[in-house]
Amino acid sequence: MDKTCRGFAEALAAREPVPGGGSASAFVGALGASLCGMVARYGAANPALADRADDLTRAFAQADELAQELVELVAEDVRAYGQVSAAYGIPRDDPARTTAIQDALHVAAMPPYRIMDACGRALALLEDMADKGSRQLLSDVACGAVFCRSAMQGASLTLFANTTSMKDRACAEELETACDELLDTWLPRADALARRAADAARKRG
């Protein structure tokens, strides 16, 4: 799925089932990871931060990988939810319909979980950049954290929309528990990072 920013926004606004919230969440997460990469690159090139240049170089490589992973999850979510839409389109009198829907729901729950997991890893890098990157770029670190937080929460809503309809409750509850653990771990940390940046900006002002 290769679109301009305008094209992606128009695709989201269209009266079509995909792309939807899951794909949008993946893209927002990719923006957060990309901001992390930018901060790390500036830091690695800054002579004043030469003592941590190796760490910063590793960080931007990791951030680039996460951004690419999240961009790929935009398309993966589209494909997965496309299977759900196709399954619901099977005639109701077809005995294969129920199984097809359930199989598709399970497939569609996986990209949102992977989006959440990638955003958690990006948030860990952003926390590191708050400590090791340039003070002048702390607001960019915080923006990245806010984006990854929003992406994680958005992806969780997409995941829950799928698990709610799953008949295999054991599988659904396992996914929901894993999702809740990510939310409980990372949302407060993202909020703390944003507050830290806001406080620092006000002190400089």
Where are these regions (language model features)?
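Short, hydrophobic/aliphatic alpha-helical segments
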Residues: 1-19
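Amphipathic, well-ordered alpha-helical segments in soluble domains
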Residues: 8, 31-38, 73, 80, ...
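Conserved phosphate/anionic-ligand binding catalytic regions in large, soluble enzymes, centered on
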Residues: 14-37, 137-155
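Alpha-helical scaffold segments that form or flank carboxylate-/histidine-based iron centers
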Residues: 17, 58-65, 108, 140-145
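Transmembrane signal-anchor/signal-peptide helices with a preference for the extracytoplasmic
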Residues: 38-50
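Amphipathic alpha-helical interface segments
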Residues: 77-146, 150, 162
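Preference for long, well-ordered alpha-helical segments
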Residues: 115, 122-125, 136-205
